[in-house]
Every structure is written in C-alpha cells, then in structure tokens.
C-alpha cells in the first residue's frame, strides 16, 4: 500500500521536531519552514522552504499532498500585526493552497489559548464558546472557524487540535492539567488524517491527565486512547512550580500567564461569566 504524502508546516519548531520520528514511518513527510533543511532528514522525509505569508511558495509545497499538518505560524503572544500575518493571513494562504492542490485532510494546530479565559474550576468540552486569552488565542479561534468553513464549503476533512503542552513531561502545576505526550499527539494526528467520518472535529491535545480541565469526549469518540498520564510526573512538575511562585491572575484561569499579561479587566466578572453556547 502506497504511503500517503503529508505536508508538515512549522517542522523546525519544537512540536514538529518531536512529531517527525513518530510519523516518518507511517507517511511520506514533506517538511516545511522558513529556514533551510535540517541535517537529519530521514529517507521518508524531504524539505521545502516556504513562507506562509508568500502564497507563491505554497503551491509547490502542497502539490501532490494527501494531507496537511499545519503547525506553522507565530507560536507566542505578540502585537496584533506580528500574530496576524502568519496566523490569520498565512493560514488562509495555506488552506487555499491545500484546496487548490486537492488535499483532502487538514490537521490544524489550535491551542488551549483559544479558550484560555475559562476558570480553572470549570471543566469544559468543545461545545462552549471560545474565550481567547491573547491575540495568539484569537488567531487560533479564527483558525478553527476557517477549518469549519473549508469543511462545509469545500468538503475538506479537518481536525482542530487545541494543544495543551507538548513535551516529554509536564513542567509545572498548570501543565499537569493540559500536558500531552508526543506519542499521544501523534496518535491523535493519525486519527485526524485517517478516520473516515471526520468533517470538522475540534478536540483537545491532552494525555490521560487526572487533573484535566477538559472533557475530551470528542477525541475519545473517534478512537483516541492516550497512553500517558501527567500524574506520572507530579513530583517533577511541582518542584518546578515551586520555582515560579504565584500569579494573582494567571493562577485563576486556564490560560495562565497569557491571561495575566497586560490584564486590566475585572477578575470576578470574568470568573463568573457564562457565555452563550455558539
């Protein structure tokens, strides 16, 4: 059986670097980022330098692709123009290129920051309204909406993964609730690329965490079975947390320090707000 060809943008980043060895045996990977190719390409990998803000560079990138894992874009908070260029305009550019190439599947790396202003005391699923905690979070909420549009309008099959924190182990108390081992993310991405019944699925990128703030039933219904748990790393996470100290705003909300940055709102009102369901 011929392996599918999957484009991975943002392949030079931390998440892409962790995913590559976990997906390379299953797919032919076309890796892409703005810089030159790394020195460790595998036989099933090739590199295409491209920029999300340059549409002309994206058509040859997507040519012949069966699927797209879109990790590219600006990955931290910044001013609006800095975030919007790659994360909003760039996302539309790569989605349009995927559509033009006949690419059937898209995995969009959304983020927990699309819902970061929910209190830590509230367990949420994927049917609550978005509550972004930053311009970065706004761009991820936009990305989910754009994937929904492409699924409905052009019959592309999309999965938006609200990634918590991808690492070999969680690094603080907050991450005990949102952490996902790279093995589990690779499993979830594979489901998004291969499950026959996906239209546009929104799921959480999290492992089997006892302290989870999220109901990940949408992922479980698709067959996701995480093999890792943050509880196996509690001692390390809490030791690291002790070095950080308290954050008066961030410790109340799921988005943490993203919520606290430049905060001038009403904490009580935000904690008690009940947004209408979308």
For the regions a protein language model found, what residue spans apply to each?
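Conserved glycine-rich Rossmann-like NAD(P)H-binding loop of the short-chain dehydrogenase/reductase
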Residues: 27-38
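Conserved C-terminal active-site "lid" loop/helix of NAD(P)H-dependent oxidoreductases
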Residues: 208-225, 240-268, 272-273
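N-terminal Rossmann NAD(P)H-binding glycine-rich loop of SDR-like oxidoreductase domains
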Residues: 4-25
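Alpha-helical substrate-binding/gating segment
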Residues: 163-169, 179-201, 208
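Conserved Rossmann-fold NAD(P)-dependent oxidoreductase catalytic core, especially the SDR/UDP-sugar
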Residues: 93-131
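NAD(P)H-binding glycine-rich loop region in Rossmannoid oxidoreductase-like domains
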Residues: 45, 49-86
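Glycine-rich NAD(P)-binding loop of the Rossmann-fold in SDR/ketoreductase-type enzymes
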Residues: 53, 82-93, 101, 112, ...
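Catalytic helix-loop patch of NAD(P)-dependent Rossmann-fold dehydrogenases
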Residues: 85, 119-155
């Amino acid at each position: 059986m011929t392996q599918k060809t999957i484009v991975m943008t943002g392949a030079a980043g931390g998440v892409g670097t962790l995913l590559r060895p976990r997906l390379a045996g299953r797919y032919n990977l076309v890796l892409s980022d703005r810089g030159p190719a790394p020195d460790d390409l595998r036989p099933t990998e090739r590199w295409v330098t491209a920029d999300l803000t340059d549409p002309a560079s994206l058509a040859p990138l997507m040519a012949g692709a069966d699927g797209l894992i879109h990790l590219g874009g600006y990955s931290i908070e910044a001013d609006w123009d800095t975030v919007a260029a790659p994360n909003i305009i760039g996302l539309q550019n790569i989605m349009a290129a995927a559509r033009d190439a006949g690419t059937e599947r898209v995995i969009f790396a959304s983020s927990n920051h699309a819902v970061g202003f929910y209190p830590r005391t509230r367990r949420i699923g994927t049917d609550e309204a978005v509550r972004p905690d930053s311009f970065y979070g706004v761009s991820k909420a936009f990305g989910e909406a754009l994937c929904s549009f492409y699924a409905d309008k052009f019959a592309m099959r999309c999965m938006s993964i609200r990634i918590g924190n991808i690492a070999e182990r969680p690094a603080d108390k907050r991450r005990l609730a949102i952490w996902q081992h790279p093995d589990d993310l690779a499993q979830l991405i594979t489901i998004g690329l291969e499950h026959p019944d996906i239209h546009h699925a929104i799921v959480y990128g999290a492992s089997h965490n006892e302290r989870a703030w999220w109901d990940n039933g949408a992922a479980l219904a698709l067959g996701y079975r995480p093999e890792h748990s943050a509880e196996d790393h509690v001692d390390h996470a809490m030791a690291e947390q002790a070095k950080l100290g308290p954050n008066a705003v961030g410790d109340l909300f799921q988005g943490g320090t993203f919520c606290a940055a430049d905060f001038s709102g009403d904490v009580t009102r935000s904690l008690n707000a009940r947004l209408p369901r979308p």
